[in-house]
């Protein structure tokens, strides 16, 4: 296993692709790059340009809450109660913790302080009273994978024929479909026509 091992080189030719990780050369038929925000520097190792937007976001979590917060839906998006405030989104994990964020995927947020976490929890509790009394736990700023034009990147690149790229926001919703399409193209050699507008070479 090569988990959490830095990749220092990627090459591809007509017959194989090679990755250098931890000083070891790994050769395979195809390499799939699905590294989120790190896809840009990884692809650059193979001479492929995949520019991304800077898209920071902040969420908070709570301590475990024993009672279910949402009975009929898995996620709530709630409009702001005050002018100038972003909307709130909320979901509860199986362990009872709540994840709370604000704004849309276009929103840029970098405030991961405790005061901001407390304020965000208080706003969420206005919609879901069961959150009152919970503790807000800040989560460090996260960076969303976001191709420069906002659309997914999926497919082989002419510059590296055995390197398959997959990059998108939101991967949570699109990953199952993208995985199925990628499998068809990698394993079966199919060309999925509706992916034509999302190929990596559009940035070249």
Segments (PLM) and residue ranges:
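Short hydrophobic core segments
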Residues: 26-38, 179
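Active-site substrate-recognition segment that forms the wall
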Residues: 35-159
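Short strand-coil-strand connectors
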Residues: 20-22
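C-terminal catalytic lobe of FAD-dependent flavoproteins
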Residues: 125-204
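A conserved short coil-to-beta-strand element within the FAD-binding core of flavoproteins
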Residues: 3-16
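General beta-strand structural signal in soluble alpha/beta enzymes
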Residues: 2-3, 33, 165
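Short, hydrophobic/aromatic-rich segments at coil-to-beta transitions
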Residues: 15-18, 72, 162
């Amino acid at each position: 296993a090569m988990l959490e091992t830095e990749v220092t080189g990627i090459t591809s030719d007509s017959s194989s692709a090679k990755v250098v990780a931890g000083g070891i050369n790994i050769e395979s038929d195809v390499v799939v790059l699905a590294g989120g925000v790190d896809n840009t520097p990884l692809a650059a190792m193979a001479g492929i340009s995949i520019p991304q937007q800077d898209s920071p976001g902040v969420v908070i979590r709570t301590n475990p809450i024993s009672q279910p917060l949402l009975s009929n839906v898995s996620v709530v998006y709630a409009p702001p109660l005050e002018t100038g405030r972003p909307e709130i989104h909320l979901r509860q994990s199986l362990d009872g913790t709540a994840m709370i964020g604000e704004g849309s995927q276009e929103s840029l947020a970098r405030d991961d302080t405790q005061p901001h976490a407390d304020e965000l929890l208080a706003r969420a509790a206005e919609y879901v009273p069961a959150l009152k009394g919970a503790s807000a736990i800040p989560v460090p700023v996260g960076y969303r994978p976001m191709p420069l034009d906002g659309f997914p990147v999926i497919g082989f690149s002419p510059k590296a024929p055995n390197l398959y790229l997959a990059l998108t926001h939101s991967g949570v919703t699109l990953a199952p479909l993208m995985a199925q399409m990628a499998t068809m193209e990698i394993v079966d050699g199919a060309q999925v026509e509706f992916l034509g507008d999302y190929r990596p070479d559009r940035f070249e």
